[in-house]
């Protein structure tokens, strides 16, 4: 109970919160009080010494009134702060709680008063005559399986330390929790009553160790009726008898709930996790809620994050050598997505459509053996020479397919990559499954396929060069694949160098410098982006005599403005 001003309806938690706020405010008001005293002292010193008026040569009497008002204000604030500090220190809020409540509320010993547990009296009071107003009220009987003759009665000796609002009784001495009937001495002390204490009660809301569990709350608040005789042998006179009775009744009630179909959750029973019972009691429920071990991640997240961070830092270093701007890496994801979409919409989708169109024309011409994806690359090259007047696009298609002898896999993989809008099935260090078997190194990786079609597309856009009669102008000048090596000492060499096949890795050679971007799934795309970025910023958007901007190939739009 609070000392000083205390509202009778204030709860224990509210008073605890108020006490903690006062403890915190005590430090703050002391600091404010010292600050206000300091300010008032400074102003008083200025008033006596007239420092400001003499230094600035101003009229003193208006300034004196202003200083007087400020000094008075700070002095009053200081007095108020010191009064609050004195109040919180000398007459703090205190509580009377039990040791259990002190532990739960996290209170210090210096600010609370603990009350020892009260002994239960063994006083027995004879039963009172039944109340005729609630005869026959037994529809809310606690347990249908219990015999009326085996239900003991609660006496007021079991409620020591309470100021309860006792509730009504049923006929034959049966105690009821009827909220409409209030307790009176005439109704008898031997009836089971509501254990809800009145707010101003100075005692803890516990009845010894029995009431320490929250599971006993239903005996205080549930609308339950006990039909039993009023023999003196049925009265409870000590805690042991009460505890035994509560345990047995809880056991019965819990078994009923576990066996009922409505018990679908372990949390539906308020007594589920209380007491040490056998696992068999909960077998029915635990079958519905089985715990399963989670699968351990193959790669620790911390290692992955560290690898991503180091990869990003390495990429920043490489890009800084090209553009002197580390902020470019913030746009890299956007550029990569646009570039992948450009490859898909500009090269892959039209290529698949043209291949299907040529295959249809081959069937109409009576050459089903020359179906693209079924015929060998040698047969397709010969057909391109023979049937060039009839199918002029066949020679161009053959250039895209001249990558691997396995034409069936190559065509099917190009079709898969063209689906999804942004090459969603792309795998940088492998490819797709083929005829029910996993990808192996005898098949080209997706990176090799994309690099090949990209170079072939630019071969078709660059003008013919007499030095490269096969028509591979871009591939011959700007793409080198191991085991061949570019001439790094030549300042005019500007090419993409594939330094590893499996897993694929690409580097950029420009003006005797090697730009080696981090390995991984985006290495090829980032190398190509750097190649195009150099063309845009250092070559005025020109690749030889071809403009890669809006008036030409129109690929530099991916970098924005």
Swiss-Prot record:
GO terms for cellular component: Golgi apparatus; membrane; nuclear envelope. Keywords: Cytoplasm, Glycoprotein, Golgi apparatus, Membrane, Nucleus, Phosphoprotein, Transmembrane, Transmembrane helix. Pfam families: CytochromB561_N. Expressed in the testis. The modification Phosphoserine is found at residues 9, 11, 98, 201, 222, 248, 278. It is found in: Membrane; Nucleus envelope; Golgi apparatus; Cytoplasm. The chain crosses the membrane at residues 28-48, 60-80. Its main location: membrane. Residues 220-229 have a biased composition (Polar residues). Glycans are attached at residues 57, 274. Residues 133-157, 260-271 have a biased composition (Low complexity). Residues 119-157, 195-234, 250-271 are annotated as: Disordered. It is a multi-pass membrane protein. InterPro entries: Cytochrome_B561-rel (IPR019176). Interacts with NUP205. Nuclear envelope protein which in association with NUP205, may be involved in nuclear transport of various nuclear proteins in addition to MYC. This is Transmembrane protein 209. It comes from Homo sapiens (Human). The lineage of its organism: Eukaryota, Metazoa, Chordata, Craniata, Vertebrata.
